[in-house]
Amino acid sequence: MVDRNSKYRKGSKIVINYFVLYFNNCCIHGFRYLTDSMLILFEKFLWLILLVASIYFCIIVCLSSIDRYYTKSTHIGIERNYIFWNTTLPSVTVCPVDRLNITYFADFCRTNGIKGPQRDILWDFLENLANSTYINFQNIPQNEQIDQIIEDIGLKPEHYTELIYNLTYDRTYEPNFNERIRCMDGAMFIHVRQVLTEWGLCYLGNSKLTEEYSSRYFIFGKYPEYNKYEYENIRLPYQVGSFFQKDTQYALLGFKGPAIIAFAHSAFEVMKVDSNSDYAYDGVLYDLSTEEITAEDNLEQDTTVAMRRCRFPHESNLTHFPFYTRNICQQECRINLAYKICKCIPHFYPNRIANPKPVCDYKTLRSCFPQHASFFLKLYEENGNHENPATCYCEQNCHDSVVTMKSMNPMSGAKQLLGGIGSAVSVKTWPQSRLRRQVIFSLTDLLVSIGGTAGLFLGFSVLGFVEVIYFFTIRIVFQILGYTL
């Protein structure tokens, strides 16, 4: 028992002597006064109070710097050197009212033995299904004949969109120039593609989104095929303008149906299903203005999503979509909300995921969705009928633009003059300021701030930190082994 106490006292003395050795030799101000034999107890106590206070305030200020780094390291500033800018024109998405191709449909009916009145019933059903969205699901026809036809051809809900796609002719690949859907600025061709939206298959022009946003990629996971008719001509991926161009415009043309539905939106975004032009029988001419939101080149590398509170397109955290925009994020919110309320999702959403959600049959689209249409579109309800409100937060786009509509007018005489209808975008005035996301407190600033704080309160430095590591790792090992340094 005595030997054990003796060993304990001896070990405690060694530990105390080692800390005294460190206090006498460390570069942190004030520690050596705690072990100085020349000072009386009151002086040592005074130095201890000063050291505790300095360490406390050093930690508080350092934590404040860390909090600033993670929560306030970026801001949105204003730039005004507008004479050096090129501003991207807004995008336009056009959805034709007549979706199906009569030739493809005839071949499908011939292959599946659909004749006579059944053929007309199926055509009407598929056209309404292809044009259906949250505001008009109730217009999908329902009767026993449709049920019988669906049963005969073995059409399952998860194949609705694939069938509509196969019966729709992508007229951006039309050899005849006058029949082709094209996006043009005078003699210059602008890239246009077929996309799958919440209003079915539509056409998008002047977009800065990647080719992953296309109907073929959403449905089959394949990029759009090479369009030789577009690449044979002088082609722009998207149209830009500058302050010195007083009137810049382009048109998305070639629609032969009785009417179209058009959406004008940011070139960095997708259309919103509730921001359409209604049915336009002569086409739509938009007079718009736009103000871009840009980002510093180092914003992505120097910050995380939580720090900058925005996402770049390739930083998708979504399940159904391979890229990110705020409107796409809200579409995923609608997917989850529809699945929660109606136990299935509409047919026009991409569903190529590890665990696909069940797709609604047309009867569920008619019965469940119309009564919740406002909730699905707004993602909230003013009267609060639903027990569990939609919990959906979508970060902003790091690159974006604010599009303001000055006017929206019909393109009178477009059918006679151009042989079809479409939508045109005109920008007559250019912004003299734009917003820019900037890093104002980088990791280097954080290290300088912490180092300056530690130096101010404790006289601490990088070498002081190395000294602590050295004393309590390498030196203590040698002390245990019995070596003297």
Predicted segments, located by residue:
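Non-transmembrane functional regions of membrane and envelope proteins
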Residues: 1-485
